[in-house]
Amino acid sequence: MTKVAVLGSGSWGTAFANVVADAGIAETVLWGRRPEIVEAINTKHENPDYLPGITLNPRLTATTDVAEAMAGADFTVIAVPAQTLRTNLAAWSEALDPGTVVVSLMKGIEVGTCLRMSEVIAEVLELPDHRIAVLSGPNLAREIAERQPATAVVACTDEQTAVRLQHLCKSPYFRPYTNTDVIGVELGGAVKNVIALAVGVAVGMGFGDNAKAALITRGLAETVRLAVALGADEHTLAGLAGLGDLVATCSSPLSRNRTFGEKLGSGMTVDEVIAETKQTAEGVKSSTSILELARAHGVEMPITEAVVAMMYHGLPPAEALLAFMSRSAKPERYGV
């Protein structure tokens, strides 16, 4: 029987492991650091800290032993905070099954290197492209854990590998599509977090749907510009991993990035938001790396630039809005 190991027992790791268990094709093992969460999953079929009140598939088992989880896994799915990936991979590398395909559920760009998550995996584990896949799309973890209808994109340069993973996680409520454009799929997932911060700020300032629509649309434009400059297919960004993920993340109160931005827009400082939420949204962490990539490739990303200025340079949201709205007038067409 095919085995899928999911490393990371947070909300998304747990929800995706449950999707695979519900699909019923593979043995599914979830690894987590915290013994109390692992015990709750195994005995009560619930992750009380991250997905309280949701009953998980009893076929899903959990362990604190990463070597046990990874042993013989055909697919090793990673769902940890993006900026911890490199450190975790170094610790796990010796337990990696020689034939496993490593799958990233993470949506971020590594600070310091500006590498996508699949690039970090390739570098640390020295794996070829056909053994690395990514899964992305409009995937709010709690909705999926509640078994509400959802879609996603499985991307790998080797289409057959993507198809194999697609079959393992297809269920009555979860419909994955395949793609070979790993660059486009990953960038769509990473940049949308930054745009969601901007949308959240606008909501926090009391602005309405016109402002949100403008930020989402122009945010998509700058995402496409960067992705194409890095070798992606622009059509990927019109799909689930681009527009779909962007709309979900910018629209939902379940989105950590939108929520973070909303609190900032309502008058809180970045430090106050971090203290209240006890976490830093991934878009905050990745925004500087995304802006570095943009500048290195001569890509204009005014919304991302404004987000970085607010998050790291203390620019008040009202001034960021003024700077954005005061830019020189341009025609609306691709690449401008």
From Swiss-Prot:
GO terms for molecular function: glycerol-3-phosphate dehydrogenase [NAD(P)+] activity; NAD binding. One of its GO terms (biological process) is phospholipid biosynthetic process. It is found in: Cytoplasm. It catalyses: sn-glycerol 3-phosphate + NAD(+) = dihydroxyacetone phosphate + NADH + H(+); sn-glycerol 3-phosphate + NADP(+) = dihydroxyacetone phosphate + NADPH + H(+). Keywords: Cytoplasm, Lipid biosynthesis, Lipid metabolism, NAD, NADP, Nucleotide-binding, Oxidoreductase, Phospholipid biosynthesis, Phospholipid metabolism. Its EC number is 1.1.1.94. One of its GO terms (cellular component) is cytosol. NADPH binds at S11, W12, R33, R34, K107, A141, R256, E282. Sn-glycerol 3-phosphate binds at K107, G137, K192, D245, S255, R256, N257. The active site is at K192. The keyword NADP applies. Pathway: Membrane lipid metabolism; glycerophospholipid metabolism. InterPro entries: 6-PGluconate_DH-like_C_sf, 6PGD_dom2, G3P_DH_NAD-dep, G3P_DH_NAD-dep_C, G3P_DH_NAD-dep_N, NAD(P)-bd_dom_sf. Its main location: cytoplasm. The keyword Lipid biosynthesis applies. PANTHER family: GLYCEROL-3-PHOSPHATE DEHYDROGENASE, GLYCEROL-3-PHOSPHATE DEHYDROGENASE [NAD(+)] 2, CHLOROPLASTIC. NCBIfam families: PRK00094.1-2 (NF000940), PRK00094.1-4 (NF000942). Catalyzes the reduction of the glycolytic intermediate dihydroxyacetone phosphate (DHAP) to sn-glycerol 3-phosphate (G3P), the key precursor for phospholipid synthesis. Belongs to the NAD-dependent glycerol-3-phosphate dehydrogenase family. This is Glycerol-3-phosphate dehydrogenase [NAD(P)+]. It comes from Thermobifida fusca (strain YX).
